[in-house]
């Protein structure tokens, strides 16, 4: 099974609140967002994205891959060496619909803050591109470190509050991640 299907889109919940779906290994991927078409990290296999403390989420218009680590990685190889629980590392995000990448990053950030209290930091492992810089800075992250192969941006709760002072009053309701 290569995971190409429209079933993921049909399982999505369209609400004004968060619209997030966890893509499990056995789940079909949205056809128009297939993992092999990842423009950020095309070299990463489906297996890599779903093993060793890693998850994939979608909102139907974007995909984000998250690794749970115990420190801030500087390379993709570090994602294997730093498996842990207290750092959520957004290591690839891409979108085929304008605005959906931003929505997914912010909604997943909020969701993890509310449901995974052990996560202390929300950091990216980003390519060293102007596009990545613009995306993360414009979405409220700060440049944490510049590395040889990557840049790390950090999303902090204080920045989320500036962007949306009432974020903590949101109810998950029908938006529970499946």
Predicted regions: what is each one?
Residues 2-47, 173-177:
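Short amphipathic alpha-helix that is part of the acyltransferase structural core
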Residues 142-156:
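Conserved catalytic-core motifs of GNAT/GCN5-like acyltransferases
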Residues 152, 157-178:
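A cross-taxonomic marker for long C-terminal extensions/tails that follow the last structured domain
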Residues 85, 117-119:
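Short, high-confidence coil segments that cap the C-terminus of an alpha-helix
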Residues 95-114:
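Conserved acetyl-CoA-binding loop-helix of GNAT-fold acetyltransferases
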Residues 95, 122-134:
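Conserved beta-strand-loop-alpha-helix junction that forms the acyl-donor binding cleft
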Residues 59-89:
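Conserved acyl-donor/pantetheine-binding loop and adjacent beta-alpha core of acyl/acetyltransferases
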Residues 43-62, 68-70:
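A short helix-loop-beta-strand connector motif used in the catalytic cores of GNAT acetyltransferases and
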